[in-house]
Amino acid sequence: GCLGNDAFGDFLWKTLEEHEIDLSLTQRTDTFTTLAFVSIDTDGERDFVFSRGADKELQYQSNIKHLFNQQMVHFGAATSFLGGALEESYGHYLFDALTQDAFISFDPNFRTDLWKNNAATFIKKCLPFIEKSHLCKFSEEEAKLLSGKEHLEEACTVLHELGAPIICITMGARGTLVSTPESKKQIESTAVIPVDTTGAGDAFIGSLLSQISKLDFSPIELSSQLDLLYNMVAKANKVGALTTTKYGAIAAIPAQN
């Protein structure tokens, strides 16, 4: 990522350090740190308004692609397709992940405020990532938007045809629809009283990828291990649900135990 050399950037840097996040590849710039203003309704659902700054200046580093070798690479930036150095870097890193035999995960993180009346461009820019990823995580809104289908099972069929072998569609309190070309199953979530859903989807995919990273076989084979995949998603559902019971994003994520 890329942070500004300002108070917000310093705050984020300190917060990530406190949570033992490796910042060795994090970049800084004199452009102000990108801001997301979040409003929350009475059900804990949130809406976003963005003031875009430093994130768009993320520079591609060709000398780190060896770090992707047979590792896991996740693409999940909400602002990744809005132009600038970040979008160029995104494309380069997708190519690097492919050439290094990485397990590729994709979350489009569609935000209405960022795209307004230009959703068609967003869809077009997502297609290569859906085609090349081993795992795609969508919200209901994203699955319908990207597939052009209103029914989720039909949406999954279209998204599989585009290339995604494993699809997880998060549905809030109703759990997650897990789909492969051969099978579909809805995994129930944990019942909670939500106060702030900010970061729930990120907590879900973070938990799922953390579990996948601990497999003793290639995660590319996960689509053939459905019972294991369903159990992983059930745990990730719980993590996402618990995240909604507190305000904030990072501070609300439950500990692994």
List each model region and its residues:
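Acidic, amphipathic alpha-helical patches
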Residues: 63-64, 126, 194
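Conserved beta-alpha-beta core of the PfkB/ribokinase-like small-molecule kinase fold
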Residues: 78-157, 164, 174-175
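Phosphate- and divalent-cation-binding pockets in alpha/beta enzyme and binding domains
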Residues: 11, 36, 114, 145-146, ...
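Conserved N-terminal subdomain of the carbohydrate kinase-like
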Residues: 1-77
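Conserved phosphate-binding/catalytic region of the ribokinase-like
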Residues: 95, 150-257
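Short gly/ser/thr-rich secondary-structure transition/capping motifs
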Residues: 20, 52-61, 116-121, 149, ...
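Redox-cofactor binding/interface segments in oxidoreductases and associated redox assembly factors
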Residues: 74-75, 138, 169
